[in-house]
Amino acid sequence: MFSYFNREPTDDFDSTSNERTNVEFKAINAQHLSYRETLESILGLFLSGKGNGVPHHCQTKSESAISRFLNYYNWSTRSLIRTIRSYILNLILAQRIKGRKPIVQVLLDLTTLEKVGKFPHLKDLIRVYNHKKGLHIVVMYLVIGNWRFPWSFRVYRGKGTASPSQLAQKLLHNLPSILTESFQIYVLGDTAFGTMKLINKIRNSFKFHTIVGIPKTRKLKDGRKVSELKTRGQQVYLKGLDIPVFLSWVWLKRDGKRVQRFVISTKQMKGITIARWGRRRWQIEGFFKTIKHCFSLHRFGQKTL
């Protein structure tokens, strides 16, 4: 982004040789050098890992300079995102091996960036959902080997708009074809993404496998609830689902008590394997903690977003 402005004037440029052009070039070069220094200061602030990611903690650039950098710029954000995604995709594709396709875990989750007060500039983006007020985003997170990448997100805008599971479907639809053709895709999510429509879509249209949570009240085609089943790994037919799935469960600690959570897989696995895959969904929680507590994402301003 800054390489163009760091280069020396070419012969063609010198051929214009008027003082005004030279002054303008120096001004532009100085401006973008300042941008670069500001970016380095922001990254240093974030990567220090102290959880002080807001501008007034920066010791090398003023709070106003950082605010200008984040709010007033003339480069394309979309182009920057495409560049970063291209770099990530190349890293992932480098993991390809001959023989059996490696697995890419696609983690889906909805998180809330809680906000207090009035936000006129954000209009309908700040909502109350699950007793939390803030910006609710559905995030798609990729895991392959030791690599972990946030890939994309969508904002949940509340009742009457696309639901979290519908937003997840849009995110999955936008996965690059070279990725889906080169790897086995396992989609992991909690009960918010365990809807019958989404599971059918993932398996029948996208041809991915899915391991998601379902509520204990979910019924089988024979009328029984999943909570009545006693054998892990057994094949079951859920009401409203066209394909067979395999059921298991995990035990979690909540408020000092053990709570049972049910997990289904569209791929045949042993019960203990399904449970292990189900637990992998919580890998994304580490990412959420990082972006909130180290990068201070939950403290974004109304115009920075």
Where on the chain are the PLM-derived regions?
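Non-membrane alpha-helical segments in proteins
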Residues: E37-L45, L108
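Short, basic interhelical loop/turn and adjoining N-cap
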Residues: H57-N71
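Single, function-defining residue in the core of a domain
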Residues: M1-R36, E40, K50, G99-P102, ...
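Active-site-proximal, Lys/Arg-enriched surface segment
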Residues: N71-G145
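Long, contiguous hydrophobic alpha-helical segments, chiefly transmembrane helices and signal peptides
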Residues: I66, I137-V138, F153, F193
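Short low-polarity hydrophobic stretches
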Residues: H56, M140-L142, T210
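Generic alpha-helical scaffold signal
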Residues: R36, T60, S64, H131-G134, ...
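Acidic/polar, glycine-rich intrinsically disordered N-terminal extensions of enzymes
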Residues: L47-V54
